[in-house]
Design a protein with these regions (language model features):
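Active-/binding-site microenvironments in catalytic and ligand-binding cores
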Residues: 1-177
Length: 177
């Protein structure tokens, strides 16, 4: 009845790290907003993309615009449990964001927690990985320059035995042919 052990960064399946990319543009969502499955579905419809298993989905929040400034850790929306499961239930296994975290900025989550005292809202996007494991990348740059799709993402992680995280040089690859 115990929890299964979370996979570590050295166990990342490398075949999942060079895949077609999809960008969700959530820059218009307010700081601290928790994106839902409906938000993801609406954005996919807007850009005309049908998710495929192993697509790499990156989320463009407004946080990337203020990277390196004090407000960075308070900026951008986050991906909630429901939004994360929407992706992973459809076979997505690698995701990324330009924000400090996949989840809503913690300063906003702390305010919501003070009002509700609901522990389920803390790191809810991260914890969705307990149901369907996935890999996430944070603090990505230049997402605003990407189209919604039509590119591949390469994101091989540095292999650190037993680590819960690691570094990756993430690049978008376009076929000019």
């Amino acid at each position: 009845h115990g929890r299964r052990r979370a996979p570590t960064i050295d166990e990342t399946p490398l075949d999942q790290c060079l895949r077609p990319g999809v960008k969700l543009d959530f820059r218009a969502l307010p700081d601290g907003y928790v994106a839902t499955a409906a938000d993801v579905e609406a954005e996919l419809k807007r850009i005309g993309h049908a998710l495929q298993p192993y697509d790499i989905v990156v989320v463009n929040t407004r946080a990337g615009e203020v990277f390196g400034k004090p407000e960075f850790i308070h900026s951008g929306c986050g991906m909630g449990r429901e939004a994360t499961l929407y992706l992973t239930e459809r076979g997505v296994r690698v995701v990324g964001t330009d924000a400090w975290s996949w989840d809503a900025p913690f300063s906003h989550t702390a305010k919501r927690w003070a009002e509700t005292r609901d522990p389920k809202i803390i790191w809810e996007g991260h914890r969705a990985g307990r149901e369907i494991p996935y890999w996430q990348m944070e603090k990505l740059s230049n997402l605003a320059s990407l189209p919604p799709d039509g590119f591949e993402i390469c994101c091989f992680p540095v292999k650190i035995k037993g680590a819960s995280a690691g570094w990756s040089r993430v690049v978008a690859i376009f076929d000019d042919g």
